[in-house]
Amino acid sequence: MRRFLLILLTVLAAASLSAQGKIRELLAAKAPEGCVEQSWDVDGVKRTALVRVPNGVTGPLALVFCWHGHGGRSTHSARHWGYPEIDKTSILVFPQGLPTVSPLVDKEGRMPGWQTSVTSEGGRDLRLFDVMLADLKKKHAVDERRIYSMGHSNGAAFSYLLWQARPDALAAIGSVAGSLRGDGKPTTPLPVIHVAGKKDPLVKFAWQQATFAAVRRINGCAEEGQPWAKEGVLDATIYASSKGAPLVTALHEGGHEYAKGSTELIVRFFRENPKGK
């Protein structure tokens, strides 16, 4: 019994150290060069995001919103997803979430995240999107045909929510380890790229497969896909759409992580799918 307790304490201590290490990594992350914090007043609350405007690029610019996962930080996403290095020609926006209830990992709502339905959290993050989009369009030459949203986990689910709530604003969305919630389905076809780990312990792979099926129905996609790309640990398949809204599924053998190759494939997919293609 004593040996069992010692083993249990060792495992718990290791898990605690791992969690502490991840927290320190999140807090210590600094914004990449060129990413500048901007702020907006949304319903009397100061909201912030890191914004990267490319240098030396002329003409209307693509605009990409990149939403961190629950408990995440905009600085960590901007630095560790590699988006500024891979996409050098788009305006990139990394918003910072507020404390949010998560039924899966944070029932008390202590960590930052995004609303999970159209009406949850008073709709605050949808209004944040509206305010940021309007302001950025005033300040910069934004290409209306190339406005995109992507994210990881809760941020991926929020991109799906934007498809439901703001379909006319977007050209396409990207999801890494997220899912389309059952309490609201989009009705307007939209190109989607979805990265999923077959061993995801949090957003179960079966849930993500159900999302694939729902997206194919909404977008009028073929049941059988064709090879599209291999990148990092990802093997991607494209499902052609009769409505001009293809689905790409990029699968890997891992879990809930932001998988290697995700950003490269999302950048390519967005470039291939402007609005009205």
Language model features with spans:
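Short glycine-rich catalytic loops that host catalytic nucleophiles or stabilize transition states
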Residues: 197, 249-255
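Cap/lid segment of the alpha/beta-hydrolase catalytic domain
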Residues: 96-126
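Hydrophobic h-region of N-terminal signal peptides that target proteins for export
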Residues: 9-18
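Short substrate-entry loop that stabilizes the transition state in hydrolases
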Residues: 57-105, 157, 170, 176-178, ...
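A domain-start/cap signature at the N-terminus of enzymes
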Residues: 17-63, 75-76, 90, 117, ...
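Conserved acidic catalytic loop of the alpha/beta-hydrolase fold
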Residues: 127-145
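Conserved alpha/beta-hydrolase "acid-adjacent" motif
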Residues: 202-207, 258-260
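Short beta-strand/loop motif that positions the catalytic acidic residue
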Residues: 194-196, 200
